[in-house]
Amino acid sequence: MQNLLKNLATSLGRKPFVADKQGVYRLTIDKHLVMLTPHGSELVLRTPIDAPMLREGNNVNVTLLRSLMQQALAWAKRYPQTLVLDDCGQLVLEARLRLQELDTHGLQEVINKQLALLEHLIPQLTPFSVASRVGWN
C-alpha cells in the first residue's frame, strides 16, 4: 500500500501522501477531493459530492436520486465507481479496489475515471439543471 501511494505521488509530481489520524489519504485534483482509505484487502476511493438539490427538507429528492442511481447502474460495467449515501445522507462517489490486483497505473486510471464521472454528475446537481429535469421550472 505504501509503495503504491509513494509511486502515485511520484507520478503525479507530488510530495509523498500522509494519512490523517483516521488513516485517510486526501488528494485534491482539479478542485475535487479524492479520499483514499485502506480497508482490509481493499483501497476505498471516496469523493463527497455537494448535492444540496438532492435534499427536500429532511427528505431526499427521490426523482433525482433515482436518475442518479440509474446512471450509476449504466456505468457499472465500465467503471468500478458507484454512488452511495453516507451515514449523514451525503452523496458520495465511491470505488472499492482490491489492493492485491492494483498497481500505480491502475490506480491512476481509477482516479481519472472518478474525476470524469464527477464532471458528468456535478452539472446535473445545479439548481437550474435539476429544475429542468424534474419539471420545477
Curated annotation (Swiss-Prot):
Chain segments annotated as transmembrane: none
Keyword Membrane: yes
Main location: cytoplasm
Subcellular location: Cytoplasm; Cell inner membrane
GO CC terms, sorted: cytoplasm; plasma membrane
Cited CDD domains: T3SC_IA_YscB_AscB-like
Swiss-Prot/TrEMBL keywords: Cell inner membrane, Cell membrane, Chaperone, Cytoplasm, Membrane, Plasmid
GO BP terms, alphabetized: protein secretion by the type III secretion system
Protein's membrane topology: Peripheral membrane protein
One Pfam family this sequence matches: CesT
Induction (record text): At 37 degrees Celsius in the absence of calcium.
Signal peptide span: none
Function in brief: Functions as a specific chaperone for YopN. It could facilitate the secretion and the subsequent translocation of YopN.
Subunit structure of this chain's protein: Interacts with SycN to form a complex which specifically binds to YopN.
Protein name in UniProt: Chaperone protein YscB
Species name: Yersinia enterocolitica
